[in-house]
Amino acid sequence: MKRDILDAKFFDTRIREENIGGKERVLGYFLGPVSVVFLNSILNNYLNVYYTDVVQLGHVWNGWFLTVFPIVVKVLDALTFLLMGIIVDRFYSRQGVARPWILFSAPLLALSFILLFFFPSGNRGLMLIWIFVSYNLFYSIAYTAYNTCHTLLVPLSTRNREQRGKLSVLTNTQGMFSGMLVAVMFPTFVIPAIGISRRNWIVLMAALAAVMLPCVLLEYFYTRERVTEESRKRGEQHIDNVENAGLDHCAEEGKINVGQNAASHKRSMKEQLRLCLQSRSWTVLMIYLVLSQLTGLLASFGTFYYCNWVLGSYNDGYTQALYYAVGNAPLGLGLFLCRPVCKKFGRQNAMAGGFLLAAAGTAVCVWNPQNIKVVLAGQVLKSIGLIPSTYMVSAMLGDALDDVEEKTGVRCDGFSSSVYNIVFTLTTGVAMCILNLGLTQLGYVAPEMDDIPLQNEAVRGFFTFCTVGLPTILYPLIAVVLWMETKRVKTGKKAKQK
């Protein structure tokens, strides 16, 4: 993408206000990205179902294709996230460092999403190659470019913590809203209607991709990078930072873009990692993300199978919808409860206590995993506990980036966004690998058009463990990690006061 093209006024943000207003929140931070979140929610919940039940790839290479494929492509995806982080750290234009890549990714997202479902079926070897290429086109290129920069929009939108906290709640509402929509509509109406017909799946996904494209453009045109603009105006201060870091010649020659963090512009990934690790907040955030994402993703991937083979019957049209609609209903109240609760108890205290409550809820589900009333009660309890963590991740990232800058004098935004997304990417691959390993090795039988099989006890127990068992084990561990950081912060504040 040429920088002179981006200098045209047509590509300027439509947001002129210095403070974040309603138009920016609604169009830029909700309606814009919600389409991508919605489609990604579909992929997280149903792409593996498409592979196992529609295309029936479960027995390819004796089941090892679906076991190895997720982790291989996610490793490649992680590498491209690192590359994208380097690009963002070294890129600057009139439109900012992140927004231009959202514009670039919009058409690629739509095209590659369709190709995930539309592939030749006559030649198995060609089909597997197509799946590999299309998956990497979507995740390693289009989604990587989009999500690296989408992740940065809230931290770069403003330095005002209150406004950033409100944006964090709003942006994380997308995940809840999209997840609920997919969880209720798909098992109730969509999946029973399209069945296991490949043609029906392809037509539906193409229509959804067409709707997504203009929404991504809304996100580009109705957001603004105020922190980037501020950095540009403080160019002289950045040059002083360069000189203090021993890079006087670069400052004198004016080789560093004014809009970039001059001290981080030429730093290697290893050096930026060293700087980030000096921030305890940054380190705790990454540990938290690994544990919470692995737990949440494995539960999410296993939910379809758990609801169809343990809690209810295959595509009965209501079990999975009830599981999500009733079980996750408290998350809707979180839009109004999250900020008051976090303000009263402290963000990390609220999150830590919430995870313990969530663990109690999943323990109720484990106690009687086939009783829908018991499971729904447990899910309601779990959802109440997860309210703080559901809405506060973006704010945690923004605070961690500010803490890195405070500790080191350097902003490592692009690098941190890459690591943030690498955690999401690799935990997705690991979770999918674990799920598919269980499917293929424990004897999962895919349904046919007119034949709904019975699954053995080992398979059913595995689905229960993925969906409600593992969270019962890991949620308390996550709470301990958050509480240790809270205790450290309080100790640090007392030491400063002395």
Question: What function would you assign to each model-found segment?
Answer:
Residues 2-246, 254-498:
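Membrane-embedded alpha-helical bundles of multi-pass transporters/translocases
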